[in-house]
């Protein structure tokens, strides 16, 4: 009994969503396996499990990857039930992927995961200052997403945090999942304090 109290088993479920090719799977693989995949393979359905320690607590974090392509719009909701935190990802070098956070992803997440903490994640931060990326976007009348633009979207969708990362360089990767773990642990209490009129149940509900 004392051993159980000293090191309790805490399990949480994280679901990651966002446009296809925005960097979701690479982010998960680098965090869970420590290596960056060199070839892009569209995700159909993948799960990983990682141990995360935050604030002296060890958490077994189940990482649920999802496919962003429209072909999987009917399959993806199977990932949502019982989630404790959701990462909505976009790619910093693809402004349209941030626009889709507002136009597609937030409504889907709110529908299937009412009350679950959301973190907005800017992937591929290493490409923001890449000359080739900047030139390609300039030719389309666009530019890489700025931190201010992304933070504004994070505020609009009610995200508990906005974090940038680069799976390729490793920048911010651990910070993303530590923040997600904290959000999954504090979600119920934090949400209920902020909005006492909300229901206490904070897990996903498939309607």
UniProtKB/Swiss-Prot annotation:
Q: Which GO terms describe its molecular function?
A: GTP binding; GTPase activity; protein kinase binding
Q: Which GO terms describe its cellular component?
A: cytosol; plasma membrane
* Recorded topology in the membrane: Lipid-anchor
Q: Which residue numbers does the motif Effector region cover?
A: 40-48
Listed under GO biological process in this entry are: actin filament organization; regulation of actin cytoskeleton organization; signal transduction; small GTPase-mediated signal transduction
Localization per Swiss-Prot or TrEMBL = Cell membrane
Q: Does the keyword Cell membrane apply?
A: yes
Q: Where does GTP bind?
A: 18-25, 65-69, 123-126
Q: Which residues form the propeptide?
A: 205-207
Modified positions (Cysteine methyl ester) are 204
Per UniProt, the keywords (alphabetical) are: Cell membrane, GTP-binding, Lipoprotein, Membrane, Methylation, Nucleotide-binding, Prenylation
Where composition is biased (Basic residues), the residues are: 190-207
Q: Where is this region: Disordered?
A: 187-207
Q: Which Gene3D superfamilies match?
A: P-loop containing nucleotide triphosphate hydrolases (3.40.50.300)
Pfam families (UniProt xref): Ras
Q: Which coarse location class applies to the principal site listed for this UniProt protein? A: membrane
Lipid-linked residues (S-geranylgeranyl cysteine): 204
Known PANTHER family for this protein? RHO FAMILY GTPASE (PTHR24072)
Q: Which family does it belong to?
A: Belongs to the small GTPase superfamily. Rho family.
Summarizing the function annotation, the protein's role is: Involved in the regulation of actin polarization. Rho proteins are required for distinct steps during polarized hyphal growth of A.gossypii.
Q: Under what name is this protein listed?
A: GTP-binding protein RHO1
Classification from the root reads: Eukaryota, Fungi, Dikarya, Ascomycota, Saccharomycotina
Q: Which gene encodes it?
A: RHO1
């Amino acid at each position: 009994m004392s051993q159980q109290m000293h090191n309790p088993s805490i399990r949480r479920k994280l679901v990651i969503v966002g446009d296809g090719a925005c960097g979701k799977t690479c982010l998960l693989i680098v965090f869970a396996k420590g290596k960056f995949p060199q070839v892009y393979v569209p995700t159909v359905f993948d799960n990983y499990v990682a141990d995360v320690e935050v604030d002296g607590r060890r958490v077994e974090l189940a990482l649920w990857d999802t496919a962003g392509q429209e072909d999987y719009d009917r399959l993806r909701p199977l990932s949502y039930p019982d989630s404790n935190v959701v990462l909505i990802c976009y790619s910093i070098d693809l402004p349209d992927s941030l626009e889709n956070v507002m136009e597609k992803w937030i409504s889907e997440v709110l529908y299937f995961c009412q009350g679950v903490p959301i973190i907005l994640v800017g992937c591929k931060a290493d490409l923001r200052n890449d000359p080739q990326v900047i030139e390609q976007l300039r030719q389309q009348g666009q530019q890489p997403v700025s931190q201010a633009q992304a933070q504004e979207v994070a505020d609009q969708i009610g995200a508990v945090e906005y974090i940038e990362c680069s799976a390729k360089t490793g920048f911010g990767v651990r910070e993303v999942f530590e923040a997600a773990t904290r959000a999954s642990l504090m979600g119920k209490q934090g949400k209920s304090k902020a909005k006492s009129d909300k229901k206490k149940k904070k897990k996903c509900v498939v309607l």
